[in-house]
């Protein structure tokens, strides 16, 4: 492009998206530069000052070294072959020095630069730190983004690796001497991601240009100028010794890229030293500047030079020639405290530092001097001071300026700033930009300025507004007191412009003005008068008082009867609560306003107290009469204050009317006595009366109905007040159901809410949110029960009783299948098998039928063992047992009330506690698995009826006659269960179902039934093993089998049990 085309119009239309290389006279693009033939590094040393400390890049490791400018110039002048190290100066900012008058950036850059055009001039301040014992060298620190002008001095073979300029700033670059080679990479999303990974790998020495999508090369010769857009990744190589001028700037048409780079810096945790200072404060100033153009509102307080806390170096200072003066330690005699610069960068630990600023008597610090006097070196004439002017103290000047700002903000609705006391803390992030906005005056848009927002600019500014709104904490700039209102209005204008470009209607939600109370309007405690709306004008009367004659107007005298005056409320919006004074509220003892007729005389609180006492006496007398009534209903508040209707017949009503007549006479007499005994009211007596009334009210509040209910709930009694009898309440002519004290449904968990309450002042109620052992676990007896027949008394005794009998009467262990039962005992055992099981320990092993006698292995005779399908003999033909140990009167089960009452399960059932039983399948698996471990228990115990006794063959004797178990006769109401095909020959399940009688079903508790399995012989198990090796030896002992076979056998048993349960 031609140099003359680089204008503001071209910029607004195209923006800065690609690098622009100009090889022309720099004056054609609005630049100002010294002559290359006469300007050298010695000129820089003379104009800037040799005692200025600079940070130099060490090319070998891309580190940094500090040295004075004079030391670097000496290194620069050394011959090329004598340089041991390569140093590169990239951070010599020459603003506020005489060199600034010789070099100017391109005209377009100066027009669009945010820092040069928007940053407040009064906030351009600095402070200087002097180093060394002699205080010759110094380092300047600035309180604004000072990045506009740089002088870059590089020796040959210097290289700067790939980087993005801080905060996404754009760069202008002019080569005065030497050459520069640039590698440029566009800021695409892919390249940004690769660059972040490149920054993280510090030890990577590979050339980054080969890892990206595209990389461009540009060679700048002496006299060339280039503009590098925001976000472009670039590296620079210096083939010859060079002297370059450049600078960084931020502008509006690169907001998205600038914010993206700023976020990448936050993500990579780049130190403050290598970032743009005061970036977020600058964003607030930019938004405030746009809002002022679009709406006329001013959000930035005009800052004064006199308010500068540090050394002012703004435009007025430069116009006075302050930048021409050399910096020397002798000119600074005021030290700056560490609190003033605690957030600034600190120098090295080993250097000697003295922080100083201009003296108080300096030419740039006195606010009362309109024209400053200068030395002879400046060439300006001195002006005599006015003798009549009296100096004003600093405190008086601050108070005067604050009063002026407050007056301006109160009178002008476009002023949205306050005095300096409302400023935010400097360099501290706050979330105040997300506070609610509140009331605001109407917004007036400048349509001419709003229409200048191009689609390109609108997209960039929308990204800026969205970023500030989403950020949790921001650094609010000095002078801005309403950041939330500023952000809201900035985004509102952008929405309006977006609606205009898209052709959609714009709906602006104007924030309603605050509804002021009458007190605020009378005292003037408001910012501006509320605008009168149409609704208010509708409510206003169309006629005036002067239009009516006096005869038609009401008298101004106040009415005798007190009226309730409602406050004036708007027709829309929330109603305001105007509290009524405490003295105007009349309450009775219960805290409610008493009801009285409109035609009654003036309200007297003493008379009301007497009436209440009389009503209480009446109610007590009525309660004594009504104690004989049968029906008593709970008391309601309405029924207690008003007289309840009597439910008696007409003769009783007539009696009540007769009794009521003398009561009225008593009331009138008491009231007359009280009135006659009243003395004349004096001031002291009135005060005493008020105090007495307050004490009486407090006493009655303490003894109120609420406190009585609380005491009753806590178990206490109200000793002061007499309990009144409960009266029936009627709703719609029918009596309500009385409230039951006891719960209708039984409490299954034994939870008593009254036990959770405690008296006030004695402790703290249990928290519903704090999980503790007390409020999580229920107090229930955690006992596991097994369903098994009831044991007799001999079996429930201690094991020592059995040990005494075992040596005298050696016998085989108890075999349930060989036991002889009479008809009654069989029925009785069947009944007991359905009773509540006895309490069993949680970890008790399942015992088997063993005894302490020595085990004599014998073969069981299988001749007398019936098959499952053999004919069952009747019960009266059963043979008697020959062994006395197998059957004894003490071992016969019998029904006893003591056992039923002492059974913990029965007690638990009476209490209403549900004890969940184990499933039948789980019990069978558990007992089958633990049968081998409990074979040699210390005492004999009956096996549960649903577990087959597979090992009983090794204890049975051949001499013991076998019995044939019988099933009860099938009743007519039961299905046919005696079918011989119920268990086929292939089914090896040892479990059968014993049918029940109707009486057993009706009387049995809701517990699982015990099932008596049919007898199973060892031969049957061997025949049903499908050719598999038997697990039992000839002597009846269980042989050891592999674990896999045991698991497989257990699985088959479980499967068969499941099929039986499903059937």
UniProtKB/Swiss-Prot annotation:
Biased region (Basic and acidic residues) positions are 390-400, 647-665, 674-712, 776-806, 813-835, 892-902, 1031-1040
Q: Where is the composition biased (Polar residues)?
A: 950-963, 973-982, 1020-1030
What is catalysed by this protein? Answer: N(6),N(6)-dimethyl-L-lysyl(36)-[histone H3] + 2 2-oxoglutarate + 2 O2 = L-lysyl(36)-[histone H3] + 2 formaldehyde + 2 succinate + 2 CO2
The record's EC number reads: 1.14.11.27
Q: Which Pfam families match?
A: Cupin_8
What ranges does the record give for the region Disordered, renumbered to this chain? 379-400, 554-750, 776-1040
Annotated substrate binding lies at 160, 180
Query: In terms of one coarse class, where is the protein primarily found?
Result: nucleus
A GO molecular function assigned to this protein is:
histone demethylase activity
Under which name does UniProt file this protein? JmjC domain-containing histone demethylation protein 1
What is the organism field in this record?
Caenorhabditis briggsae
The opening ranks of the lineage are:
Eukaryota, Metazoa, Ecdysozoa, Nematoda, Chromadorea
